[in-house]
């Protein structure tokens, strides 16, 4: 008979393996071990930030995988406490029966989860605890059965919801099969009691000038944004594309006016989730997948840092890192007024690190291509190149030589990125005489680059050499002035 000592020894061995992994991030949240996906159920409640995520544990002997909706909370957005699982394994099926994504409904007096249960349909859970630890299913679950013939044009999948006046609304599914609504879409339902739901119709009509017919509206999140509304989502085809619409909402229909993209396939970022806190901030998290396998390393996937989504006066999107991250800074290093000429590259003393925040102000003077290199080994065998191209009006993150590990597999859905194509291109138009303001967060195997408070570029890289920590600046043509550089080491928030 096995005792707790047996399990404790195994737990110790797993923990030691995690601690020794030089690519395991220190201040980006990730579970203690195992693989997970999709962030769910974000809500600010009773003075705490609460997040859920879908945990998967392989269990080959009975041909099933264990699936649960895990629950964490924090007072400061940085240090997270584990709760018992919000929703535990309720499924009676074979391997592949997982929880699907869901949402804590907005505007509710009683915290309410709406989610899709495989082979059952849309289910609702409510909680009366101050710490949101115990969730009770409605007796009427599933409130929208997956096998119903009542809504033939709807796809029962990935719900989100909110309360408006005395009416509950839910966006159900990532497609709608009504003719004329091809491409990404979702279906609107409403209810007076959370138990009986009526179908309204397609929530919005997508346009091929913005999105392809193959795209869908998964992990939807709909909310007021400035004077408009925003619909946030990700698509499966192409994979790793988080995008949003900003538009107006009227008579139970959303009319998109602006389309924007938060991530590109090479970023491995998907599964967006937001909440609004007691400061009125709309905070965003995304799920960043891995190019390494959990079976070999014992863990897989991380969360983005918390992003603050802000509407501009023109009802467009600005993105900034949450201000709480500043409390992790220590050991500052400040450099001013560096000038680079044609085909010049320099290493800046004092900046080498694999866990830091790096802020730069760069003025391009007739330079077309310039940028910064991170995770550089002294001989440049390993390097990650972040290049801005003024002619192309885009950033190119070149991670072709970011790692000498040739077993990495950057999966984008069914597609695997091949050597020779390990580049991420992110459109960004720099105005005339405008400086580049870069706020770069480096955390061992992930980079997040906030650009002029307008976009955030995410990239996973896996430098293997212990000396791959140098920071270099380069100018390929013209001339640039680097007016200001500040680097801070960043304190760890993960226990290991």
Region roles according to the model:
Residues 10-15, 248-496:
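Beta-rich accessory regions
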Residues 218-223:
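Functional cores that coordinate and move charged inorganic groups
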Residues 1-158, 163-212, 224-266, 286-336, ...:
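Beta-rich carbohydrate-recognition and catalytic domains
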């Amino acid at each position: 008979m096995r005792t707790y000592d047996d399990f404790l020894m195994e737990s110790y061995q797993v923990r030691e393996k995690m601690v020794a992994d030089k690519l395991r991030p220190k201040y980006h949240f990730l579970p203690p071990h195992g693989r997970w996906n999709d962030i769910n159920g974000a809500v600010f409640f009773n003075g705490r930030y609460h997040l859920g995520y879908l945990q998967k544990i392989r269990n080959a002997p009975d041909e099933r995988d264990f699936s649960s909706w895990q629950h964490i909370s924090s007072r400061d957005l940085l240090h997270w406490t584990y709760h018992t699982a919000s929703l535990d394994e309720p499924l009676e099926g074979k391997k592949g029966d997982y929880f699907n994504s869901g949402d804590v409904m907005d505007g509710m007096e009683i915290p309410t989860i709406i989610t899709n249960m495989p082979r059952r349909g849309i289910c609702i859970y409510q909680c009366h605890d101050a710490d949101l630890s115990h969730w009770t299913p409605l007796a009427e679950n599933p409130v929208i059965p997956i096998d119903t013939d009542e809504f033939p044009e709807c796809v029962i999948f990935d719900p989100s919801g909110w309360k408006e006046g005395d009416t509950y609304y839910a966006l159900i599914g990532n497609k709608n099969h009504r003719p004329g609504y091809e491409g990404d879409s979702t279906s609107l339902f409403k209810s007076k009691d959370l138990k009986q739901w009526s179908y309204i119709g397609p929530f919005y009509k997508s346009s091929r000038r913005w999105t392809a017919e193959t795209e869908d509206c998964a992990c939807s999140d709909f909310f007021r944004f400035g004077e408009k509304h925003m619909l946030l989502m990700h698509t499966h085809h192409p994979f790793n594309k988080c995008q949003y619409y900003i538009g107006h909402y009227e008579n139970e229909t959303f009319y998109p006016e602006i389309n924007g993209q938060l991530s590109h396939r090479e970023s491995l970022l998907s599964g967006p989730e937001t909440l609004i806190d007691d400061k009125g901030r709309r905070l965003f998290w995304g799920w960043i997948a891995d190019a390494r396998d959990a079976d070999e390393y014992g863990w897989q996937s991380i969360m983005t840092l918390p992003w603050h989504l802000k509407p501009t006066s023109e009802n467009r999107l600005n993105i900034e890192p949450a201000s709480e991250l500043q409390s992790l800074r220590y050991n500052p290093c400040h450099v001013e007024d560096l000038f680079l000429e044609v085909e010049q590259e320099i290493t800046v003393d004092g900046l080498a690190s694999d866990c830091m925040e790096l802020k730069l102000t760069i003025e391009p003077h007739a330079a077309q291509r310039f940028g910064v290199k991170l995770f550089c080994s002294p001989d440049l065998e390993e390097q990650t190149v972040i290049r801005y191209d003024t002619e192309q009006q885009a950033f190119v993150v070149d991670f072709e030589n970011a790692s000498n590990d040739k077993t990495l597999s950057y999966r984008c859905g069914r597609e695997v990125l091949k050597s020779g194509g390990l580049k991420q291109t992110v459109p960004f138009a720099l105005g005339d005489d405008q400086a580049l303001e870069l706020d770069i967060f480096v955390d061992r195997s992930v980079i997040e680059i906030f650009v002029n408070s307008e976009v955030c570029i995410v990239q996973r890289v896996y430098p293997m050499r212990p000396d791959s920590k140098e920071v270099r600046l380069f100018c390929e043509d013209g001339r640039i002035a680097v007016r200001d550089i500040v680097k801070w080491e960043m304190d760890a928030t993960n226990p290991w």
